[in-house]
């Protein structure tokens, strides 16, 4: 199973903390956010990861290298110029199989990625989005439902 993790952003909303370290590398306890995500993905059956890097790419390469010490095969897709989620996917698409996970590298969750992936394949869905219903209004990442499983 493969995952494309988007880690190329500048983390501007967290400045000054992200001035010298990208948000996915910020520590939570004794590990970085991205280390926690990689462990969760590995536990869910992911064995190959492509990191879509941009901002401070050298830090990701230096720390994660080929992924061997994390029990994963990690490669890198380099964005010279940030082109958003679609641009990062387009740049890495030749390395990915038909079904793969795309996720942000700064989002911690208890989602079972393996279970979601199996459900996606079982339904032969064109795409599957993991979301969390909130009552608190937010300015970004808003999803509206038509039914329980269909989006507007």
Regions found by a protein language model. Give the residues of each.
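N-terminal nucleotide-binding beta1-loop-alpha1 segment
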Residues: 1-19, 42
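Conserved N-terminal catalytic core of the sugar/cofactor nucleotidyltransferase
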Residues: 2-5, 27, 31-104, 113-115
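Histidine-centered beta-alpha loop that forms part of the nucleotide-sugar donor binding/catalytic region
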Residues: 8, 54, 132-133
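Active-site metal-binding loops of divalent metal-dependent hydrolases
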Residues: 10, 106-107
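Pre-signature/interface helix of ABC/ABC-like ATPase nucleotide-binding domains
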Residues: 15, 23-26
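Short Gly/Pro-enriched turn/cap motifs at secondary-structure boundaries
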Residues: 16, 81, 132-134
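A short helix-loop-beta submotif of the ANL/AMP-binding
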Residues: 20-23, 72
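Conserved core of the sugar-phosphate nucleotidyltransferase
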Residues: 110-152
């Amino acid at each position: 199973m493969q995952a494309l993790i988007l880690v190329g952003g500048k983390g501007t909303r967290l400045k000054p903390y992200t001035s010298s370290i990208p948000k996915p590398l910020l520590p939570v306890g004794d590990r970085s956010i991205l280390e926690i995500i990689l462990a969760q993905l590995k536990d869910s059956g992911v064995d190959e990861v492509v990191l879509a890097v941009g901002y401070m790419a050298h830090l990701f390469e230096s720390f994660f290298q080929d992924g061997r010490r994390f029990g994963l095969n990690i490669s890198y897709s380099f964005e010279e110029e940030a082109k958003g989620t679609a641009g990062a996917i387009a740049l890495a698409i030749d390395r990915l199989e038909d079904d793969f996970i795309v996720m942000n590298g700064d989002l911690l969750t208890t989602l079972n990625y393996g279970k979601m992936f199996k459900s996606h394949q079982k339904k032969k869905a064109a795409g599957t989005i993991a979301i969390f219903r909130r009552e608190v209004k937010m300015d970004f990442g808003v999803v509206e439902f038509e039914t329980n499983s269909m989006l507007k």
